């Protein structure tokens, strides 16, 4: 890890420890987004549930983060970074303890929601502190230092989760957060500055509530199709309510002088295409960390630790491709890379339908590694094209909306995957783990087709990959 730079501004404690504190918060957030996936079958057995009904444990965390993220910047400006970071760690730690003690799926999901509220504030508030505590010329170096643990979290999460399930129990994937959280609280009191904005402005509470209602209602309606056993009338009602709330937010934003997210953001074509493409393409990508461990354990007979180890090729290839792929994007442009790679990503996802218990190990590893490289290419290109043409005065709001869409896409990916698993289980009769392989195959093909279809969105980019708005100045998204 590179040496942490030192800020010139006054902080509450050691500036290098401040960076470590923010980095560990980022690590905790990303670790808990992946560590539960390999433990879901063990959780299901312990709680007396079907492994195919455990999606709420993942969706509750990701959806809560999507809902809370838009409010974090204003909360930090209004109440101070130290107070909000303390609150974030406290809620995350309490949520972890509640998860470990949960005796039912309902209470476990509620605890994951509490954990998600804290997790949603860790990185945005930490990034805000680094931005204000370090001079501009040191910001990129400081954020690079902070980002490394965030990359390590998803890398070790599935493997650590599977190992803990085998050597102890699934409860320990949450209990390991407790000592880290307690140390984080003490470190925040000593080393986190309580930076506040002199005039944070008025928060668009009405717009925020409409947007939150839209996200939650649409997600719950899809979740109602995925094994919750809700009546079709309730599912349709929730979907209509969600779409109505989304339309109401748009009308509200058009009339409000200071909306949560201004509609003017979508006048920048590259941002509009990037956000829409991110949402739909990430449904496929977001489904995979949920589906793959279930496939390996339920249909192919892997142990939790073995399933976790099989996720390592995905993570390693994802990290290894990031540097060379930027040269490819610069050479070919955004549109050809995104259109071609989105189709390829859909084919890779559908290709997991070909997995069998007799498949050679080397071929399975190669398939997972290739998927990791293609998936990482998709993220790199989508992230860059979405933010590159935003004007400086819109960058903060645009980045916040983009972060929300990323988490929403992950949540919807798991929700859609669970709904498809449930539907294909009914149609194909594969409810028992030994009979579930055809169900997983059909689900992977459907998710792959949905992902490949989202390539049509990226086709709307200009041929050179630039935004179509003629006067939008280019800013460095790094």
Name each model feature, range by range:
Residues 1-14, 459-478:
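Intrinsic disorder in cytosolic terminal tails and internal cytosolic loops
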Residues 8-12, 137, 183-212, 254-269, ...:
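Flexible interhelical linker loops that connect adjacent transmembrane helices
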Residues 15-31, 36-40, 47, 51-61, ...:
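12-transmembrane solute porter fold
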Residues 63-67, 97, 151, 155, ...:
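Hydrophobic/small/kink-forming positions within alpha-helical transmembrane segments
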Residues 66, 86, 93-94, 117, ...:
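Small-residue-rich packing faces within the transmembrane alpha-helices of Major Facilitator Superfamily
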Residues 69-206:
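Helix-loop-helix hairpins in multi-pass membrane proteins, especially solute transporters
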Residues 97-98, 163, 216, 220, ...:
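Alpha-helical transmembrane segments of multipass membrane proteins
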Residues 178-196, 212-224, 241-255, 454-462:
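C-terminal membrane-cytosol helix-exit motif in multi-pass small-molecule transporters
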